[in-house]
From Swiss-Prot:
UniProt entry keywords in alphabetical sequence: 4Fe-4S, Chlorophyll, Chromophore, Electron transport, Iron, Iron-sulfur, Magnesium, Membrane, Metal-binding, Oxidoreductase, Photosynthesis, Photosystem I, Thylakoid, Transmembrane, Transmembrane helix, Transport
Catalytic activity, as annotated: reduced [plastocyanin] + hnu + oxidized [2Fe-2S]-[ferredoxin] = oxidized [plastocyanin] + reduced [2Fe-2S]-[ferredoxin]
UniProt-listed Pfam families: PsaA_PsaB
Protein name: Photosystem I P700 chlorophyll a apoprotein A2
Species: Prochlorococcus marinus (strain NATL2A)
Upper lineage: Bacteria, Bacillati, Cyanobacteriota, Cyanophyceae, Synechococcales
GO molecular function, one term: chlorophyll binding
Recorded topology in the membrane: Multi-pass membrane protein
Amino acid sequence: MATKFPSFSQGLAQDPTTRRIWYGIATAHDFESHDGMTEEQLYQKLFSTHFGHLAIIGLWVAGNLFHIAWQGNFEQWVLDPLHTRPIAHAIWDPHFGQGLTDALTQAGATSPVNIAYSGLYHWWYTIGMRTNEQLFQGAIFINILVCWLLFAGWLHLQPKYRPSLAWFKNAESQLNHHLAVLFGFSSIAWTGHLIHVAIPESRGIHVGWENWLTVMPHPEGLTPFFSGNWGAYAQNPDSIDAVFGTSQGAGTAIFTFLGGLHPQSESLWLTDIAHHHLAIGVVFIIAGHMYRTNFGIGHSLKEIIEAHNTSHPKDPHRGYFGIKHNGLFETVNNSLHFQLGLALASLGVACSLVAQHMGALPSYAFIARDYTTQSALYTHHQYIAMFLMVGAFSHGAIFFVRDYDPELNKDNVLARILSTKEALISHLSWVTMLLGFHTLGIYVHNDVVVAFGTPEKQILIEPVFAQFAQAASGKMMYGFNALLANASSSASIAANSMPGNHYWMDMINRPDALTNFLPIGPADFLVHHAIALGLHTTALILIKGALDARGTKLIPDKKDLGFAFPCDGPGRGGTCDSSSWDATYLAMFWALNTIAWITFYWHWKHLAIWMGNTAQFNESGTYLMGWFRDYLWLNSSQLINGYNPFGVNALSPWAWMFLFGHLIWATGFMFLISWRGYWQELIETLVWAHQRTPIANLVGWRDKPVALSIVQARLVGLTHFTVGNFVTFGAFVIASTSGKFG
């Protein structure tokens, strides 16, 4: 007899309804809930999935390399990066008529192609790649790596090669390995690639497999390193007249501290980037030798954490603050959800920083002038950051439900956070209301006075504190005599005393979008507070969901109901919308709105600067109708014209995505508004009709069709809302930017 899906749960496998399928899919990756799962098996399975995950990433990277090498125009783009549109891949579609075929035959191609807005061309060019052959070689190498990773994943599931539970819980060895080997060595290795391959290529010197052992990165070789004369590596940097990819203006330095941008490529100096990776690598390798493992030297994490308490005889607070950190080492080390929450939060912050820095400190040659790519990458990384951050709180809540031990954490900082949750949640609630009422109040006031023809009556507040922070970093335009904006300050004197040329002040005072601190005014002040409202409300919902995960006054035994439950059951009034999963679900809507506001702001401000029309954002951004009319509507018009009575144009695929994204988004509401009763009745009506229709009733089914649970229907609704949201906005960003700048 064939085993029914899911094999990991006999209870579900015997369910006679379609619940078996949907619950099976929903819990396929919840290894903890599977039949017969031990803690050791759980760790081993997760460890093997890491190799599979890396293999999928590798296939994706190899696919990009292969398709661009095969169908792209990398070699043509390299010859003129500023005026050649990069091709992502060809499009073959039998439905295309001649009009669309002609419209999408672009960028010098002879058949329909997609334009690349990924920044991959800029990245590969910057790191020294110049030919399709090199891209093919990269794809082949990564595919070999993928095969090795898949084998490693399989191998570590075999009894002989499964790591033990003690190995997984050896925190010090794990830290040393991740810090020194994964982060440290990989940073040093990347430094090696930059100085051996990328920097020479940027100076017109080709380094390949045939000569990389004979072309020295620096004329003096390793002599300065071993003699301690490290400064030699910073002498003779590229001049400000340097032309990227040629010997014109090229120097010999490999590690510099120039600051600012290479004037011609308008990206960070490659020698600065190499210096950064070298320093990061050294720091991580030192950090990777800090923790006590084989030789009994170094720090014990448990000792460090437990020293963070107020039992020290010289501590003035001794005996007042409790035992603070006792029990935290075991709590974190024994909870995968706690560890995952920390990792997701860290990666979420890093990803949001990447979004900001790709615009403010562009590291790839000529990418700053590819406005559509810059817009797409900012949006892409902020959306990813949002998902990671929401996931961090979700797994924090699961930790409180599944892994938290009240006895182990008695009276420590974790227990105290739980015991003061009412104060934390109510203060966050107060902050969100203050932000919301004041920000919306000012926006609406401004809308009203503008509508009545008296724009001079708007409430316009200059962001003086932010302007002061910019001035302290060197921005002169505001007239603050602070730190780097004051030539006689100690900061300026120290900066000017550094030997050699430095270009930070040139960059921060540029008049265009390549200044790393854009000029800000009242429109920025308002949208900043609107975004702060969104962030605080998202945080409020998520923090409340996590801190209330174990129980509340309304449902004191909530931890026994699990992370995701629809209502608290009969006999108690059936309180709904109260599980930690519901908090995640509700927070996602706020998170999506907030990310939309963040990306709206970044995109509109940059569009205005790129088009030389900064007044549009500065004047229209102070009231809501300005945002709706001069950003959303004005930039949607090109999308809506992708198809028109005169035929189609190259924006038509984005126009189609824009419309279809709205449809997906709206479909979400069907699941969010209609609950189980409606769907169950609809299903039973369809079943009744099917069973009474000749020919159709020859086809039957084993599982009795039942409606999705409330939690599942919400997930389906949220998924449609989310996918529709970013399909719509992704198409909007790409089409509205590329429609203006190509």
